[in-house]
């Protein structure tokens, strides 16, 4: 009884201390962090509101047609965003198809296979690649990457896959494929770095259990490590996609900046971010400026939608994994 009474007295003492004025600092910190979190939400809302206000006249005039028409004629004040939406999505998809396998493979090698003497230099090089300004990568793309692609890989791709609409037609230097490749170079270090940290966080118990069952290193990496970390890896891919959708300078310098919808990846294209960078200073009429604001609103909406879909998919994956674990 004496022990129980002592415990009860101690619990009341702890509760009293937590409710005392000395805990004002904790409450202040809680409210401060809450205010910072809400400030982020308010900032996003204000950005969307400003884009909506800036494009309200264009929205009323063109309506839904703005998203599904391909005419972009500032002189006649006829505007449609479809070529830019198409160019943004296709170039981002190309970038993901190239960067995701390379990034995850690199992260797995650095985490599971690379000896210590080579691991740190490779990590440093990847971090340096992420620090290169996009305009520098754009210059490299113009003077090094595009001539090389035009002379070697593009003709090879046309010989092998020219029977498909994706690699048919004449070969241009600046093109959708070149834009996708330069974006892949830019998002590769981001996805690699995040994926590496995710794989490093996998418990050693996962690996030891796989080895205990007789798995090889490759089998342990594939079954125990990559499978365990798939939710986090998907998040890393979405982070790279967010960067790909908004990339501006480098892709503007290599994609060709032609508002068209073409199946061939050898043809020039245009992205939402590129048209904003190229034409915002040239908008000499109110409607032209309104249309560019609506382009910004579309890009903003696509980015928000992609992130919301990613969160939904992550929750679905987590729910499925939990259900399988229970079964």
Language-model region placement:
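Membrane-interfacial helix termini and adjacent extracytoplasmic/periplasmic loops
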Residues: 60-79, 139-185
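Transmembrane-helix boundary motif in ABC transporter permease subunits
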Residues: 95-126, 310-319
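Transmembrane alpha-helical segments of polytopic membrane transport and secretion proteins
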Residues: 1-36, 310-327
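Transmembrane alpha-helices
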Residues: 125-128, 132, 136, 191-198, ...
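Interhelical loop and adjacent transmembrane-helix boundary motif
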Residues: 251-301
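C-terminal transmembrane helix and the adjacent membrane-cytosol boundary/short C-terminal tail
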Residues: 196-200, 204, 211, 281-327
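Periplasmic/extracellular loop-to-transmembrane helix junction in inner-membrane transport proteins
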Residues: 13-27, 31-32, 51-95, 115-116, ...
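Hydrophobic alpha-helical transmembrane segments of multipass integral membrane proteins
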Residues: 86, 90-98, 102, 106, ...
């Amino acid at each position: 009884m004496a022990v129980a009474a002592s415990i009860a007295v101690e619990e009341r003492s702890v509760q009293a201390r937590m409710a005392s004025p000395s805990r004002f600092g904790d409450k202040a910190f809680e409210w401060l962090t809450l205010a910072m979190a809400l400030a982020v939400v308010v900032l996003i809302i204000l950005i969307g509101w400003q884009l909506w206000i800036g494009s309200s006249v264009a929205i009323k005039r063109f309506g839904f047609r703005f998203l599904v028409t391909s005419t972009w004629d500032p002189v006649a004040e006829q505007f449609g965003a479809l070529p830019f939406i198409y160019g943004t999505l296709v170039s981002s998809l190309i970038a993901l198809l190239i960067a995701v396998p390379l990034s995850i493979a690199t992260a797995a090698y650095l985490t599971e296979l690379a000896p210590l003497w080579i691991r740190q230099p490779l990590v440093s090089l990847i971090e340096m690649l992420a620090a290169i300004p996009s305009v520098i990568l754009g210059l490299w793309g113009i003077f090094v990457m595009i001539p090389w692609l035009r002379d070697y890989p593009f003709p090879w791709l046309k010989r092998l896959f020219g029977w498909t609409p994706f690699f048919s037609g004449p070969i241009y230097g600046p093109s959708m494929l070149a834009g996708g490749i330069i974006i892949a170079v830019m998002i590769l270090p981001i996805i690699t770095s995040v994926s590496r940290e995710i794989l490093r966080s996998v418990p050693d118990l996962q690996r030891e259990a796989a080895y205990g069952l007789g798995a090889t290193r490759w089998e342990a990496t594939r079954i125990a490590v990559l499978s365990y970390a798939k939710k986090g890896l998907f998040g890393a891919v979405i982070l790279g996609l967010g960067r790909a959708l908004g990339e501006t300078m480098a892709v503007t310098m290599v994609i060709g900046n032609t508002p068209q919808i073409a199946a061939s990846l050898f043809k020039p294209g245009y992205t939402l971010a590129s048209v904003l960078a190229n034409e915002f200073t040239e908008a000499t009429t109110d409607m032209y400026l309104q249309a560019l604001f609506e382009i910004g609103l579309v890009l903003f909406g696509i980015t928000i939608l992609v992130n919301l879909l990613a969160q939904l998919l992550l929750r679905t994956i987590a729910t499925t994994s939990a259900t399988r674990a229970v079964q």
